Amino acid sequence: MVFTDTSIYSMQFVGPPDTFGITIVSEGISIRSPNSAVAIEDNVFWMGNNEFYVYNGAVQKIPCTLRDFVFSDFNNLQAEKVFAGVNSSFSEIWWFYPSADSNEVDKYVIYNYQQQIWYYGSLNRTAWLDRGVNELPISASTDFYLYNHETGDDDGSTNPVSAGRNCHILLIPYLLPYAVISS
């Protein structure tokens, strides 16, 4: 896949004399930044200017319950900092982006492509690498640290949890585990 600011092309090996053949896949399609697309399982996912897309033989908009939430709190002057990552252990595509009040990436939105649900949160990250080279996903931050993801224990408290599917959004402010003790 080759992205421009308004179109997507497919580039395939065709052999000599041309070596590669280029065909247009879709016109009138945007991509938020050069790093906002990722490929997994024969699909390419990306964040456009106001939509999320997947290419799986054809370009399709991904229904997103958090679309307005993400794009209404977005710093367009820092759009080139948007990047995508894959967490293949959980069938997730992560997009990291700067919120309206930030000049650095401080928010994320996740799409679980197996369950077709969305989640979001706040996290300062500048790069992401899925497991493969390492046992776990690893990311970088503006504090000059590398972080292992999907490891360790909780920090003793819960974060707000939200999930969306099609036109329904679920917000759970806190999760409180409890035990039933009986004699």
Label every PLM stretch briefly.
Residues 26-183:
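Beta-sheet repeat architectures centered on beta-propellers
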